[in-house]
C-alpha cells in the first residue's frame, strides 16, 4: 500500500503542521475507497520496481533518472514493460534509465513558457493543483523549491508519480496526495501555488480562485494557466455540450475577464505573461498514449476550430499575488 507517512513526518515541524489534524483521515478514507479496482493491481507493479539508485538525475532541464548505463538490456526491457502497465502516460516526457516515456503532452514546452515569468522558486514551498503524474513538480524541484506538494485525485496519476519517485529516490521532497482542492482546509502556507489546466474543468471558477487564494500566504504567488478565448472582460464561452470532445469544460473566459475575476478575488499585481495556441505537436497520440488526442478533437477541415465549432484551444498564463483580503470578501 502506498504510504504517506514520510510526508506527515516532514510537515510535522513546518507551517503545514495544522494540516495533520485532518489529512491522515482524509487519505485513509481515499485508500479504503480504492481498495478495489485498479489501484491494488498498480501497487503490485510498484512493488516490483526494485532497481539501484540512479547514477544521475536531472530535474533542471528535463526529468531524467539514470544515465541508461546501469541496467542490462534485459533489465531495461523488464523495466519498460512494467512502466507500460501504467499507460496511458499523459504528462511528461520522462527519461528513466534510458527509456523515453513519450507522453501525450509535451509538458516541458509549457514549463519553458512559464518558468521565465515566475518568482524564483528557491527555498519556496510549492503547491501544484491538478498535478497529473507530477512532471511539473519535478521541474519545480529542479528550479530550487524546498518542498513541492501536488494534489490530484486520480489513482493512475498517483501510481505513475510513485513509479518515478521510487526510481529517482524516495528522499526527494516531492509528494503527490490523491486529493481535490475542495478537500484542503485553508492552509495560508504556500509561497507559490500553480493551477495549470484546471480552471475550465471547475463548475464554479470563482470558487476555484478563492480556494487557490486560501492556500497561499499573504504575498504568495499564483501561477494560473488555463484555456481562454478572445474578447473583452465580458467574454466567456460556456460550451453547450462538449468542448474538444470533453464533457467537463464549463467556463472559458477571455484574458480580460479572467483578470477581472482575479481582482474580484483580492489578487493584486495581476498580469498575463503568455498566450499560446496549443500546437498539434504539443498534444498528440504516442506509443505511450495510443488513444485519441488533439488532432481528433479539432475540425478536420479547419484546425482553428474544435470538432464542435468552438475556437481551438488557446492557453494563457496569468500571474497574481495574494493580497490581504478585504472584510467584505471574507464575510461574503
Swiss-Prot record:
Sequence similarity: Belongs to the class I-like SAM-binding methyltransferase superfamily. CmoB family.
Gene Ontology terms for molecular function: methyltransferase activity; transferase activity, transferring alkyl or aryl (other than methyl) groups
Gene: cmoB
Enzymatic class: transferase
InterPro entries reported in the protein's UniProt record: CmoB, Mo5U34_MeTrfas-like, SAM-dependent_MTases_sf
Complex formation: Homotetramer.
SUPFAM superfamilies registered for this protein in UniProt: S-adenosyl-L-methionine-dependent methyltransferases
Protein name: tRNA U34 carboxymethyltransferase
Taxonomic lineage: Bacteria, Pseudomonadati, Pseudomonadota, Gammaproteobacteria, Alteromonadales
One Gene Ontology term from the biological process aspect of the record: tRNA wobble uridine modification
KW Transferase (keyword) present: yes
Keywords, ordered alphabetically: Transferase, tRNA processing
Keyword Signal among record annotations: no
Catalytic activity: carboxy-S-adenosyl-L-methionine + 5-hydroxyuridine(34) in tRNA = 5-carboxymethoxyuridine(34) in tRNA + S-adenosyl-L-homocysteine + H(+)
Record's function text: Catalyzes carboxymethyl transfer from carboxy-S-adenosyl-L-methionine (Cx-SAM) to 5-hydroxyuridine (ho5U) to form 5-carboxymethoxyuridine (cmo5U) at position 34 in tRNAs.
Positions annotated to bind carboxy-S-adenosyl-L-methionine: 91, 105, 110, 130, 152-154, 181-182, 196, 200, 315
Annotated Gene3D superfamilies: Vaccinia Virus protein VP39
EC number of the protein: 2.5.1.-
Pfam family, one: Methyltransf_9
Amino acid at each position: 500500500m502506498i504510504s504517506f507517512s514520510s510526508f506527515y513526518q516532514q510537515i510535522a515541524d513546518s507551517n503545514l503542521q495544522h494540516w495533520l489534524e485532518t489529512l491522515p483521515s482524509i487519505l485513509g478514507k481515499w485508500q479504503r475507497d480504492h481498495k478495489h479496482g485498479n489501484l491494488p493491481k498498480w501497487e503490485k507493479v510498484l512493488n516490483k520496481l526494485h532497481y539501484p539508485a540512479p547514477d544521475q538525475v536531472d530535474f533542471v532541464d528535463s526529468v531524467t533518472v539514470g544515465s541508461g548505463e546501469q541496467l542490462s538490456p534485459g533489465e531495461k526491457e523488464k523495466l519498460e514493460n512494467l512502466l507500460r502497465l501504467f499507460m496511458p502516460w499523459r504528462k511528461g516526457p520522462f527519461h528513466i534509465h534510458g527509456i523515453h516515456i513519450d507522453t501525450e503532452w509535451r509538458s516541458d514546452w509549457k514549463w519553458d513558457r512559464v518558468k521565465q515569468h515566475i518568482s524564483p522558486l528557491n527555498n519556496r514551498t510549492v503547491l501544484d493543483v491538478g498535478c497529473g503524474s507530477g512532471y511539473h513538480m519535478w521541474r519545480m524541484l529542479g528550479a530550487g523549491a524546498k518542498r513541492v506538494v501536488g494534489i490530484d485525485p486520480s489513482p493512475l496519476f498517483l501510481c505513475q508519480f510513485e513509479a518515478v519517485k521510487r526510481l529517482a529516490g524516495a528522499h526527494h521532497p516531492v509528494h503527490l496526495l490523491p486529493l481535490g482542492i475542495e478537500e484542503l482546509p485553508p492552509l495560508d502556507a504556500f509561497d507559490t501555488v500553480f493551477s495549470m489546466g484546471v480552471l475550465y474543468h471547475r463548475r464554479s471558477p470563482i470558487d476555484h480562485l478563492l480556494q487557490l487564494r486560501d492556500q497561499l500566504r499573504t504575498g504568495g504567488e499564483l501561477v494560473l494557466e488555463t484555456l481562454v478565448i478572445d474578447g473583452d472582460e465580458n467574454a466567456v464561452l460556456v460550451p453547450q455540450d462538449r468542448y474538444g470532445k470533453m464533457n467537463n469544460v464549463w467556463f472559458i473566459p477571455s484574458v480580460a475577464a479572467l483578470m477581472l475575476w482575479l481582482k474580484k478575488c483580492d489578487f493584486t499585481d495581476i498580469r498575463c505573461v503568455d498566450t499560446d495556441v496549443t500546437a498539434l505537436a504539443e498534444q498528440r497520440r504516442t506509443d505511450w498514449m495510443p488513444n485519441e488526442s488533439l488532432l481528433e478533437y479539432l475540425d478536420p477541415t479547419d484546425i482553428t476550430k474544435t470538432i464542435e465549432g468552438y475556437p481551438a484551444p488557446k492557453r494563457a498564463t496569468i500571474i497574481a499575488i495574494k493580497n490581504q483580503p478585504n472584510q467584505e470578501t471574507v464575510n461574503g
